UniProtKB/Swiss-Prot annotation:
Region Disordered, residue ranges: 1-28, 124-254
One Pfam family recorded for the sequence: OCIA
Lineage: Eukaryota, Metazoa, Chordata, Craniata, Vertebrata
Comp. bias (Polar residues): 124-141, 169-186
The protein, known as: OCIA domain-containing protein 1
Main location class: other
Compositional bias ranges of the Low complexity kind: 157-168
Similarity field: Belongs to the OCIAD1 family.
OCIA domain residues: 1-114
UniProt keyword list: Endosome
UniProt biased composition (Basic and acidic residues): 199-219, 234-247
Gene this protein is translated from: ociad1
Keyword Transmembrane helix included in the entry's annotation: no
InterPro entries: OCAD1/2 (IPR040187), OCIA_dom (IPR009764)
Subcellular location: Endosome
Amino acid sequence: MAPSPAEFSDQQQPAPHRTVQPPGVGYIPTDDERRVFRECNEESFWYRSLPISAVSMIVTQGLISRGILTTSSRFGSLPKVAFAGLCGYLAGKVSYMKTCQEKFKRLENSPLGEALRQGYRNIPTQYPSGTSEFSDVNPKTASPADGFASNVVEPPSSVYSSHHNSTSDTVPFSTSLGESSPSGISDNIAPEPAALLEDTPKRKPMTYDELRSRNRETYEMAVTQRADAPVRSSLDRAARKDVKTNKYGDVWEE
């Protein structure tokens, strides 16, 4: 018996996707999930934590024996070796986390596995791509020409010319030919006080002959001072020779 059109449409309709809420704090894992937890704990210890911890402890002990790392005076090399083993244990657990997640994602009828699969595969629909909450343009009414026209940048030359015209209109230039500056600017300039200009004494111009005679006088004065200096020094020396002094430099009077 051939299926009816209604039954055929029901068979062609895909099953609705079941969304699973992420497990909370009070989530109780299923038996399969507990089994995977135990497997992950054992495998991460034997396959990752133990080998990495052993290698770290051996390398640390080798560095201590060569003198690269110093030992404690009380406990010896035990603190550094134990710390290296702990770091290796934690590194092994962290490195096995990706493998454990893959095991949970392969589980069927597992809320935890379904949550992991949705987190890695689906994109949240509450953040649709291509729209912005700050955009005010309606996508149904906006056209490509409008968007292109709104993004056109005005050239610098036109901006400068429009700004220059606006500023030139606001400044009131005078219409007379004798004035080259705006009348509004020239009116604000304070005139210089005439009294100060009149009080300043005017220097009399000096001729070439006057300057020559002044230089000659200064030269003659310098020559006479130089000629008097040797005479004074010779007189002082003669006076010093006539005066008798003792061995201490004191003047000896007879």
